[in-house]
């Protein structure tokens, strides 16, 4: 038995050459934790609560979104979809300045996106949304003829998701391309602070 039953943090510490790790009881939170360093409650990689619920506070997981409309996007040009804000970025792996996720470790990542498009020109040849990664690109494409739009212009919502292999340092983002037609499409942004108000967003998390 480790500990005397009183309110205290107890741990087993692994003293490495450059990095220490611990397995211990964070008494103030009533959690069994595994993490880096010697101080419980900080840099926790894995935590088990009294109900057996497991949390991973440092697991890469981001939900980024476009905060405002991008209007009259140029056709015949690849346009990186802006993701300048986020609801959460659990391990600080998403750059809201360049709209790019960078994998912190090698693994399999689930990447999904939803893009709202308005004022699509029915005379365009096709449009596409892509998940662009260092190891390959994955696209959803369509053309106005498949929609038989009753009016010109028209709008559409696109969802895409893929599990991809990423090495540490690999990147991922979403982009949009329209072939032909006029430069009039708008990429919807989020004009509210609620999840329900989002029109274009991206989520990424480490699966394994």
Roles of regions detected by a PLM:
Residues 1-43, 60, 66-72, 124, ...:
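Self-maturation zones of extracellular/virion spikes and adhesins
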Residues 17-22, 44-45, 89-93, 98:
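Short small/polar-residue motifs
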Residues 51-208:
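Extracellular jelly-roll beta-sandwich "head" domains, especially the C-terminal globular C1q domain
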């Amino acid at each position: 038995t480790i500990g005397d039953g009183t309110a205290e943090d107890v741990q087993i510490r692994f003293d490495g050459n450059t990095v220490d790790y611990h397995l211990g009881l964070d008494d103030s939170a009533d959690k069994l934790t595994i993490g880096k360093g010697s101080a419980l409650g900080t840099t926790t990689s894995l935590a088990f609560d009294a109900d057996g619920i497991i949390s991973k506070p440092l697991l890469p997981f981001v939900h980024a979104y476009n905060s405002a409309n991008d209007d009259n996007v140029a056709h015949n040009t690849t346009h990186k979809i802006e993701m300048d804000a986020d609801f959460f970025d659990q391990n600080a792996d998403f750059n809201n300045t360049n709209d790019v996720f960078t994998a912190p470790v090698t693994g399999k990542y689930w990447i999904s996106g939803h893009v709202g498009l308005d004022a699509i020109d029915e005379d365009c040849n096709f449009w596409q949304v892509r998940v662009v990664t260092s190891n390959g690109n994955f696209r959803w494409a369509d053309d106005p003829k498949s929609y038989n739009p009753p009016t010109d212009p028209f709008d559409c919502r696109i969802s895409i998701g893929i599990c991809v292999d990423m090495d540490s340092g690999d990147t991922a983002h979403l982009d949009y391309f329209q072939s032909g037609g006029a430069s009039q499409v708008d990429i919807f942004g989020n004009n509210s602070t609620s999840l329900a108000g989002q029109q274009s967003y991206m989520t990424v998390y480490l699966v394994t």
